[in-house]
Every structure is written in C-alpha cells, then in structure tokens.
Amino acid sequence: MKELSSAQIRQMWLDFWKSKGHCVEPSANLVPVNDPTLLWINSGVATLKKYFDGSVIPENPRITNAQKSIRTNDIENVGKTARHHTMFEMLGNFSIGDYFRDEAIEWGFELLTSPEWFDFPKDKLYMTYYPDDKDSYNRWIACGVEPSHLVPIEDNFWEIGAGPSGPDTEIFFDRGEDFDPENIGLRLLAEDIENDRYIEIWNIVLSQFNADPAVPRSEYKELPNKNIDTGAGLERLAAVMQGAKTNFETDLFMPIIREVEKLSGKTYDPDGDNMSFKVIADHIRALSFAIGDGALPGNEGRGYVLRRLLRRAVMHGRRLGINETFLYKLVLTVGQIMESYYPEVLEKRDFIEKIVKREEETFARTIDAGSGHLDSLLAQLKAEGKDTLEGKDIFKLYDTYGFPVELTEELAEDAGYKIDHEGFKSAMKEQQDRARAAVVKGGSMGMQNETLAGIVEESRFEYDTYSLESSLSVIIADNERTEAVSEGQALLVFAQTPFYAEMGGQVADTGRIKNDKGDTVAEVVDVQKAPNGQPLHTVNVLASLSVGTNYTLEINKERRLAVEKNHTATHLLHAALHNVIGEHATQAGSLNEEEFLRFDFTHFEAVSNEELRHIEQEVNEQIWNALTITTTETDVETAKEMGAMALFGEKYGKVVRVVQIGNYSVELCGGTHLNNSSEIGLFKIVKEEGIGSGTRRIIAVTGRQAFEAYRNQEDALKEIAATVKAPQLKDAAAKVQALSDSLRDFQKENAELKEKAAAAAAGDVFKDVQEAKGVRFIASQVDVADAGALRTFADNWKQKDYSDVLVLVAAIGEKVNVLVASKTKDVHAGNMIKELAPIVAGRGGGKPDMAMAGGSDASKIAELLAAVAETV
C-alpha cells in the first residue's frame, strides 16, 4: 500500500476517474444553493441531485469530485472518537444513467488494489452487501475477492423518501488484531459493532429503483436510468494509508495540532487525554471553510452551528490553558494544509480571521456573563440550603452561555455542590427533540421524469429579439408527448424562441403565441429549462397547436424591459456593495421581477443608513454616467482574466457570457440586460434587512417604481408638514423636533408629578406596619397607573427603615400586579412571590431583594394580602 499525502490521495482519486472518462466537478460551496432541505452541503452527491432526479441532464454522465462537506448532528462526539468530524471531504464517482454495477465494482477494486494506484493489499479488504443483491456478490467474486471477505448486511439498502434508491456495497480496511483486543473478528462487521479494526473507506450505492413509501420495497419500480453514487472519506483514507491510529494523526490535522501545542505549551499525547486538541483542530477547519463560503456566526440556523463550534473550541482552548483569543491564529495553517485544492481559505484569510477573532472577543464577554450567572446560582443554592445544581440551570449555562458541562461541574464541585446530570440530559433531549421537529424533512432526490428527460430536440434562445417565427418541435400534455393539443395547459418546445427561461434570479418571460392568421393560440405563463437545457414553455392553450407548424412567438416587451432595468441595476448594486462595505459582500441569492429587485448578500451586520446612502448614490451615479453595456461569449478562464465576477453557487459550462457595464461592473451572467445604464432611469433602496445569520437583503426599485417611491415619500412629507404647520417642506423636520422636545418636557414634568403623588401616597402606605414571626412587614393594595409605579413605591421604601418586607398589590386594567421587596436575609422575595402569586391566578419570580408577578384574578387581592403574614 502506498503511503501518500492527503493531497496526493485526492489527486490520484480524481486522476483515476478521469482516466475512466469522468469529468471533474469542482467542490461546491458549503452553503446549499436553492435547496431548503439542507442546512449544509453534507455529502458528495448533495450538489448533484438535479442530475439524479433527471431535472437536468449533465454534459458528461460520468462525474467525479472531491466535495467539502459539513455534518453537525453529532458535535458532542467530535474529539472523543477517532473518526468523528464536523467538516470532512467526500471523494466520489458518479454515473448518471451510464455505467452501472459491474464497472463501479471493477473500477473501484482496480483503484484500491492496482500497484499503479493506491496498491491496497487485497487480503486487507472486506466488503458488505445487501443479501438480495447477488449480482454485487458475484461481481466481487469475479474481481478475485474471497467469499470469506464478503459479508451480507440487511441494512445495506439506501433510500431517503421517494426517489432514487437501491442496494449499496461498502468497503472496509482491516487494521488487524491489534485493534480487536477481544478477538471478535468478522462479527464486528456482521453485527455492526462499533470498532477500530474494520474501517469503512468507501460506499458504493447502486441506484436502480424509484423508492415509493406507499409500497413494499419488493414492488419498487426500476429507474428508467440507473445511477451510481459513491463516497469515500478522504480523512479515513489518509489515516489508513498514512498508518495513523486516528484521522487526527494525519497531515490534515497534525499541523493544526502542532500550532495548538505552541499556543498552549502543552504536548499532544496520542494515547492520553487529547480531546481538546482534536476539538480545536476539527472545529477551526469547519469554521474557516464555512465562513469563507459566506456563512457567519449567529443565533439561528447555520450561524448558530458556527457559534456553537467556535465556543466549544474556545472552551477547550481554556482547558489547555489558552485564555486569550487564539483560534483566528490557526486560519493560516488550515489554509496552507488545503491550499492545493482549496485556495479560497488563504484568499479570504483576512476576512475569516477578522470574523473568528471578533466572535472570540464577543464570547469572552459572554463567558464573564456566564460566570456571573453561575455565581448567582450557587449563591441561591447556599441561601436555600440546597446542595445540587439543577439540570435545567446547567443546560442554560451550556446552551445560552456556551459553558461545557465539565466546566460547570468543576466550578460547582470546587464550591461544594453536586451536579444534576440526569436533569441536564433530560433538558438536552428536549432541545434535540425540538430541533428534530423543526428540521425540514428532505434529502430525497425526487422522482425521475422520463418524459422531460427524453426531450432531445434542439432549441435556441435568441437574446436580441422580442418576436420571431419558429417551428413547434415538442408538445407535452398530461406528462405525455403528443402531436397536437387544442385545450388545457401544455408544455411546448420550439426550434428557437425569444422567451427567456427563468434562471440566475431573472424571472421568465410571458407573452403570446400566434398562428399564421395572427390569432393568439396560446398564452405563455412560464418558461423553465428542460433537463437537456431547452426552454420549456408552459402555456394556456386557446386554439389548436400541432408539431411541425410554424408560429409567431411574442414576449411581453414592456415586462421584459422592466425586468431588465432591475437585472442591470442588480449588477450595479453588487459592485457598489463591494466598494462600500467590502468584497466579502458576495451574492447569496437574487430575484429580478417586473416590479422590484431583491438582492441577498453575505455581511456580518446591518448596513448603516450612511452606507445605504452611499450605495444608492453610487448606483445612481453609474446610471447617470450612461455606461455602455456589452456582452461577450468566451471561456471561463478568459472571462476571469477580464475581471468577471463568478456568482455564488453557479456552475458554468465551457462557454460563458460576460456582461460588462462600462468599466464599473463585469460579471458572468446568462440573463438579459439593457443596452445602456441610463435606461434604468432611477434606483432607490426601499428596504434593508437580515434574513438569517450573516445574510442581509436589499430590496430596491428602478425606473417608474423608483419615481413612485420618491413621490410617495414626498406626499407623506407634505402631510407631516401640514400637520405640524411648517411653512415649507424643508422646515418640517425642525418643527417635528420642536414638538418632540416639548412633548419630552411635558412627559418629564408629568413623571415628576406622578413621583410626588406616589411619595405622598407612600407616606400613608408605609404607616401601616405589621409583624409576624419577628419580621416587620407592610402589605397594601395601591392605586397606580402602571407596574413602574410599584417600583417607585419600593424605591421610596428602601430609603428609610419602614419595615423588613414590603408587599404591594395593584389592579391595573384586567390584570393584577404584585411586588415583594425584602431587606432581610430571612425572607427571599423571589420565593415569597412564588407562594403569593398563585392566589391571584398569577406567576412570577425574582431576586432575593426584589420580585414581581402578574395575575388575572383581582377578586382574590384581599386573600393575598391576608396570606402575607403566613409567608414571611
């Protein structure tokens, strides 16, 4: 077996499959594009769904890739085991309706065992297979695999909901009896026992059925096009081929671990407690790649995952004695390790480091807050005479403040308290159940549509015309091809068309189809790309249509021009964002409609009003500069030399279209555009908002809609000016400010009067002092306007020694408000209010010295006041 670096393994994999006629699919962005079922790209096949379900036909049905992936369903185990990771690389080879079982197994065995390639010893390889899949068993035998090395496993059948499914065959490497101390042998595989002896290095999925949850597996129908989907973990292959005990002791992780050794002054012990080193090395890889791909730490979705990974890594750094910010210093090492195939980490190093460091600094402040919260919890336990920290409180520290359980346990035990582990596990399970319930169930490839996939007739989109005559090539009605149609809805393909198919954020054209008499025979309501790329017109049929007949196709010109204004403005906006807030503000999605444009981009904070003003000004400057817009068709490399920006998540063919707006913007784009920027007329941003962690959205309007937006603002300003009696529009702001100042003065004066009235009323309330159990208390119903007045009473009460405890109740509207304040350690206000509040059908809580509650039963106020003597 060859001893190869991880980069050599990756390259050899790709080279082998290229030698078998495969094209190399570049690694896609970790943030999924147009797939709401996935939080992250989590496998090599995740980006190829469109090929497997037949919605798009690839240029080459044989594909290979090395795909960066993230899985976060088992974060707690990362660092504890030899092979758990958050980010990993999946090497794959795929056949879309081309070769199948025989070639997949034979070529896979060749790659693994040939001296020209990986040169694995054959006697170290074991294969599992689905018991009913005799064809795979026989093919392995034909390759020279001993029957004793083939293990039937009932679970070797891959399916996720409806869509492509089939048996799979897995390949394992036997590391020998040294990793099997109990000498269990092949039972480890047959009974699926967790072990370190047999390492799964490759899974070959034979996708041959259309899974249907409504019928038994034996009744699944064969796919019209059978597929191959395989995945081999680079980290596992590297561990095996480099003779490493764990994945972490390979060249993918050890350089990071060595840097952590320098930062911590600690030494990594392969046989000792090395969990913190592993956690840091794993998590900084995931953080570096995810942030580089546009995801940012936050409080939900992907952002929450990244924040959790970073905080977990920071806490493990503290366990190693690293108390300052340090994770950002590891980004360079991650980039250097992966540079040969993933140069983007080094290219975006400054931005990634900035985000990681800023998040570390924020977490440092959070840790201080968490420590304060833990101190309060321990003080409360002491006051209540308890000896155990409850699981729900431990979970809050873990979930809200990022405190690992072991840190909470250590600090609590140092203070002499026990830990409620079972309560913590219960709270954790509740959260996991909620998270699972919230996940969009997905991942299914979707059923293949043989009718659409079978469209092979050529069709060409004509950019520079709004109307043309063309022959009707294909009619599909009720999912069947037909020669003619006279009513209902149908799908049409023409030899050529002026109708733009929805793509790249630009909506489809609409319009009409006319016969040779000039009569409208169909209304075009949508246009989408067929699996083989032809524009597929969805039409409402008004009269007879037949294949082979020529028709006149007319798009809605006014609508197209409105869409083009927004699309061209989107390019200007993208460039302006780069100039004003930074090049990290890359496109994360767009929509160019007739009425507006919507642009999503990566950014770590809200765009300020001043920045929005600069962006809007810059876009309008380019409109007024009347920049010529040109389009050029060329190859990707030439386009990049021209400075063209390749958009987020897009895949480009051999020939690309470059749209250049003067010297201001150059982008790869297949959409339609104006001839000159001046045709946009006017650009106005109407909204900026966050739509998820690290992603902002701008909604803007152009042309007529921009004019309407400005006119509506002017009308509103005129109305305000009239209301405040401003002589001119320019005076309205000053008049509003003057009114605001007057209102503030009145409010201040009113508050002072209320305070004086409350103080006067308090004098009467504070005279009625009672005593019970040696505690002096005041219990009274007061007439106040809001709960804030109760706090004012309490503040006045604290100034003098009226009593030890104060209980105030007020009926405000339909609600009852209760306040308890205490100056004595013998009475805990928070605990006392928990006893009193239920009397008025309420609940509440608070600190030892002050607590408040709300209730709904005002008829029980007297009963509550009478109960005070019993509860002090």
From Swiss-Prot:
**The protein's required cofactors:** Zn(2+)
Matching entries from Gene3D superfamilies are given as: 2.40.30.130, 3.10.310.40, 3.30.54.20, 6.10.250.550, Bira Bifunctional Protein, Domain 2 (3.30.930.10), Threonyl-trna Synthetase, Chain A, domain 2 (3.30.980.10)
The note describing how and how many cofactors are bound reads: Binds 1 zinc ion per subunit.
Where is this gene product found?
Answer: Cytoplasm
Q: Which InterPro entries does the record match to this protein?
A: aa-tRNA-synth_II/BPL/LPL, Ala-tRNA-lgiase_IIc, Ala-tRNA-ligase_IIc_anticod-bd, Ala-tRNA-synth_IIc_core, Ala-tRNA-synth_IIc_N, Ala-tRNA_ligase, Ala_tRNA_ligase_euk/bac, DHHA1_dom
Broad class of where this protein is predominantly found? cytoplasm
Coiled-coil intervals: none
Entry text on domains? Consists of three domains; the N-terminal catalytic domain, the editing domain and the C-terminal C-Ala domain. The editing domain removes incorrectly charged amino acids, while the C-Ala domain, along with tRNA(Ala), serves as a bridge to cooperatively bring together the editing and aminoacylation centers thus stimulating deacylation of misacylated tRNAs.
Q: What is this protein called?
A: Alanine--tRNA ligase
Organism whose genome encodes this protein: Streptococcus pyogenes serotype M2 (strain MGAS10270)
